[in-house]
A protein has these predicted regions:
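Phosphate/pyrophosphate-binding active-site segments
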Residues: 2-10, 145, 181-183, 206, ...
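Thiamine diphosphate
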Residues: 40-114, 116-123, 263, 268-278, 283-287, 313-316, 396-474, ...
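Glycine-rich, acidic loop regions that bind phosphate or pyrophosphate groups
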Residues: 4, 109-150, 246-349
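Aromatic-enriched
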Residues: 172-199, 346, 357
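Glycine-rich, anion-gripping cofactor-binding loops and their flanking helix/strand elements
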Residues: 72, 220-304, 405-436, 449-451, ...
Length: 562
């Protein structure tokens, strides 16, 4: 819960001034957004802040994803702003994306004056109603006296339990109204995690100790527990698989890592899971892209499911032990009760299945191919690099091939699968981590969704490198149509050729077309080493596929492809 500590100096604020004051009190250093008439009072107050830097995005969706990039890399709530009407509706996709991926955001929008709500005033939309299904919580502030509690509650809610976005819609007259406040809310803090029973921990430990073929299944909810996750895996010798959102929780080359499961996961991993007699599921929600046909997923396995969100327990698969709690808190009590076991027979079976179902990486040494490019880029940077992706084939190729070795290194749109995520998220990551290199893997379809944010990267001279795999197509759509639809490919290829090099140069980015370089690896190293933003372009054959692939509606063992 929020701290009960208070300060007792009476102060006079406009609503807008209080908002900025409160953000400063929360330690917010960067706010991103686009101003408009209904939020100009807040921007007027923000202009006087010596603590908060404003990043002017080129589109409100870009602002939302920039905020996500900041929040995903440090786990703290980040703030985005927009005006009413189109400003608010342009934010919707980025906020919905944050909701599905459990990202703590504070979204502040202006609204028409309270007396005009419901009159179809200029740039009026029902922001409160629109945002109900896509936020963890939302507010329409009708009176200035509500602001202190609303702001404090918003920050607490965004970061407590399962994190998520909170939307605060503030009419313009509330922003300009004046009030005096004597007792200012102290810094908002996370609410305490739910308590859990010792009996459930003992039951879970007994199941792990008795299991012959256990698998540790990690989802995005383990993001704050990397040390204990690894300790559990290593002590109990648990083969460990990860969802798309959990990649990096165990280093790619760790001997217990099975890599990613599911639709485009490691072929052997999907078969190994079918042999499991116990699944220890931490912070995962049994997403359909991860488990395939539900009734055929791990049919012989008992399930221990730990998640901070009660709604996820039993929603898709019924657990034998369900624990609603913070994963790190649970592991702190569980690990001492878990026996160290070699599990030699199980590891031999895992190794046999990995040999039977290998995971080849074609053209791994060719920097002008999909996998080869990813490997070549990885060779140019150290383990501190932050990786973002857009959504499509390039996303899956990167998930399969890039050596992800640490939490919060990998930023991708998992639940909503939003094209246009990668570049603004990379900008946010670079703003929050100015000493780290940020690599954004994108495709031509995705990059065009928020290409205008190249201007934001350029203006702020951020060390963001865009690696563009250009197949002049919507690659995953092209793949699914060619594989599973009788009429073949339709509306998935672009007839015109876009000169991305000229576009990037026009925004002020350095550029490199690897197809025109005599030594692509050397050219790649040289441009990645340069400070500032850059576009690296490679042409990819539109017929390239992401394999293996679980067909829509199929079981994970019904994979197709090489």
């Amino acid at each position: 819960m929020a701290s009960s500590g208070t300060t007792s100096t009476r102060k006079r604020f406009t609503g807008a001034e209080f908002i900025v004051h409160f953000l400063e009190q929360q330690g917010i250093k960067i706010v991103t957004g686009i101003p408009g008439g209904s939020i100009l009072p807040v921007y007027d107050a923000l202009s006087q802040s010596t603590q908060i830097r404003h990043i002017l995005a080129r589109h409100e969706q870009g602002a939302g994803f920039i905020a996500q990039g900041m929040a995903r890399t440090d786990g703290k709530p980040a703030v985005c702003m927009a005006c009413s009407g189109p400003g608010a509706t342009n934010l919707v996709t980025a906020i919905a994306d944050a909701r599905l991926d459990s990202i703590p955001l504070i979204c502040i929008t202006g609204q028409v004056p309270a007396s005009m709500i419901g009159t179809d005033a200029f740039q009026e939309v029902d922001t409160y109603g629109i945002s109900i299904p896509i936020t963890k919580h939302n507010y329409l502030v009708r009176h200035i006296e509500e602001l202190p509690q609303v702001m404090s509650d918003a920050f607490r809610i965004a970061q407590s339990g399962r994190p998520g976005p909170v939307w605060i819609d503030i009419p313009k007259d509330v922003q300009t109204a004046v009030f005096e406040i004597e007792t200012q809310p102290a810094m908002a803090e996370k609410a305490a995690a739910p308590a859990f029973s010792e009996e459930s921990i003992r039951d879970a430990a007994a199941m792990i100790n008795a299991a012959k073929r256990p698998v540790l299944y990690l989802g995005g909810g383990v993001i704050n527990a990397p040390a204990r996750v690894r300790e559990l895996a290593e002590k109990a010798q648990l083969p460990t698989t990860m969802t798309l959102m959990a990649l990096g929780m165990l280093p790619k080359a760790h001997p217990l890592s099975l890599g990613m499961l599911g639709m485009h996961g490691v072929r052997s991993t999907n078969y190994i899971l079918q042999e499991a007699d116990l699944l220890i599921v931490l912070g995962a929600r049994f997403d359909d892209r991860a488990i395939g046909k539900t009734e055929q997923f791990c049919p012989n396995a008992k399930i221990i499911h730990v998640d901070i969100d009660r709604a996820e327990l039993g929603k898709i698969k019924q657990p034998h032990v369900a624990i609603q709690a913070d994963v790190d808190d649970v592991l702190a009590q569980l690990i001492p009760l878990v026996e160290a076991q070699p599990r030699a027979e199980w590891h031999q079976l895992v190794a046999d299945l990995q040999r039977e179902f290998p995971c080849p990486i074609p053209k791994a040494c060719d920097p002008l191919s999909h996998y080869g490019l990813i490997n070549a880029v990885a060779a140019c940077v150290d383990n501190n690099a932050i990786i973002t992706t857009d959504v499509g084939q390039h996303q899956m190729w990167t998930a399969q091939a890039y050596p992800l070795n640490r939490p919060r290194q990998w930023l991708t749109s998992g639940g909503l699968g939003t094209m246009g995520f990668g570049l603004p998220a990379a900008i946010g990551a670079a703003l929050a981590n100015p000493d780290r290199k940020v690599l954004c893997f994108s495709g031509d379809g995705s990059l065009m969704m928020n290409i205008q944010e190249m201007a934001t990267a350029s203006e702020n001279q951020l060390d963001v490198k865009i690696i563009l795999m250009n197949n002049e197509a919507l690659g995953l759509v092209h793949q699914q149509q060619s594989l599973f639809y009788e009429q073949g490919v339709f509306a998935a290829t672009y007839p015109g050729k876009i000169n991305f090099m000229q576009i990037a140069a026009g925004f002020g980015l350095e550029t490199c077309d690897l197809n025109n370089e005599a030594d692509p690896q050397a050219a790649l190293q040289e441009i990645i080493n340069r400070p500032g933003p850059a576009l690296i372009h490679v042409r990819i054959d539109a017929e390239e596929k992401v394999y293996p692939m679980v067909p829509p509606g199929a079981a994970n063992t019904e994979m197709v492809g090489e």
